[in-house]
Amino acid sequence: MYKLVLIRHGESTWNLDNRFTGWTDVDLTETGIAQAKNSGQLLKAEGYDFDLAYTSVLKRATRTLWHVLDEMDQTWLPVEHSWRLNERHYGDLQGLNKAETAKKFGDEQVLVWRRSYDTPPPPLAANDPRSERSDRRYANLLPGQVPLTECLKDTVERVLPFWNEAMAPAIKAGKRIVVAAHGNSIRALVKYLDNISDSDIVGLNIPNGIPLVYELDENLKPLRSYYLGDSEAAAKAAAAVGAQGKAVAA
């Protein structure tokens, strides 16, 4: 049996402000740092030990990973960064407050933009200063690989090659891996692993800073999955994520 540990980054400054973040490179809040440290403490207390770590190229995920590994006394661990693990790109919504956007366009439309499988938000203009196409960290990518918007389907299509070419072979080689990423890049992996339908994925929310453990068979098919720590607290945190895009907070 293999194990895979997935951690959504701790609370970011734009999570706190209830803004659409996407590829915008915002930092963790003090709460987010505490969540990341708590994840590391949970993993250490449960006897987890890793050989390899993966994260995105966005600081809220990379710093979450660092705090996790620091609490585990494993900051020396090899870490591979990949843009393919970045958050889903939210296009022209990036930087906007989710509740205010829902008041303007309606809860239903914002839910479609946030959680539907194949409907992207309105794109950024190519010359929009919020675009990442001139960012050095993406200099080796083809222009079309740096998105102006994405739906979850697009996110799945960029995450799965990294799973197939890097993560899955490492797991099968016996490497114990931890992944610190983002709500939608983790949703993409969970959709694939659990074979969740395009319609059912709408209801899946990933809470900040709580380790999600997958136990996998020899073919990397899930035997079971669970959040470490207080399962009721994890469920409440996931429900809170789902309520972020409503005009009136739930």
Curated annotation (Swiss-Prot):
The record marks 182 as: Transition state stabilizer. SMART domains: PGAM. It is an enzyme of class 5 (isomerase). Substrate binds at residues 8-15, 21-22, 60, 87-90, 98, 114-115, 183-184. This is 2,3-bisphosphoglycerate-dependent phosphoglycerate mutase. Keywords: Gluconeogenesis, Glycolysis, Isomerase. Belongs to the phosphoglycerate mutase family. BPG-dependent PGAM subfamily. GO terms for biological process: gluconeogenesis; glycolytic process. The lineage of its organism: Bacteria, Pseudomonadati, Pseudomonadota, Betaproteobacteria, Burkholderiales. Residues 116-135 are annotated as: Disordered. Pathway: Carbohydrate degradation; glycolysis; pyruvate from D-glyceraldehyde 3-phosphate: step 3/5. It comes from the Bacteria. It comes from Polaromonas naphthalenivorans (strain CJ2).
